[in-house]
A protein has these predicted regions:
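N-terminal glycine-/charge-rich "phosphate-binding" loop or analogous flexible N-terminal tail
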Residues: 1-48
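Phosphate/diphosphate ligand-binding glycine-rich loop within oxidoreductases
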Residues: 49-120
Length: 120
């Protein structure tokens, strides 16, 4: 399996090991510093079965040009960078897209209460 990690510098700023992912097969970590265009994303994802990203937006043309892609994981709580149309198209193509829906929920609640206490 080939896994491409886009936004590698955000997902792993240097304190996490990629070794676990390397055990899954071929790993390509792309440390893009700016928003890549569709052609660049397509080039990076060629031959990949899985992709991981944080904030890079993906459009339909990317999925159309990457027929082997079957799984996309977003290291975020939402799907903001993917349009509803893209999510429907991915479902039609059998591409699984997942996120981390409960990431940071306790920390956000704790922070909100700390801010409320600061007002007292």
């Amino acid at each position: 399996m080939k896994l491409v990690i886009i936004d590698g510098h955000i997902i792993n700023p240097g304190d996490v090991s990629w070794v676990g992912f390397e055990k899954l097969g071929e790993l390509s970590v792309w440390n893009n510093k700016s928003e890549p265009d569709a052609a660049t994303i397509i080039q990076e994802l060629q031959g990949a079965q899985a992709a991981m990203m944080r904030q890079t937006a993906v459009r339909r043309e990317v999925l159309e040009a990457c027929p082997e892609l079957k799984f996309i994981t977003l290291t975020s709580t939402g799907y903001d960078q993917l349009s509803p149309e893209l999510l429907r198209y991915a479902r039609e193509r059998g591409i699984t897209i997942c996120n981390i829906p409960s990431y940071g929920t306790p920390a956000v609640a704790q922070h909100a209460f700390a801010l409320l206490l600061e007002l007292c």
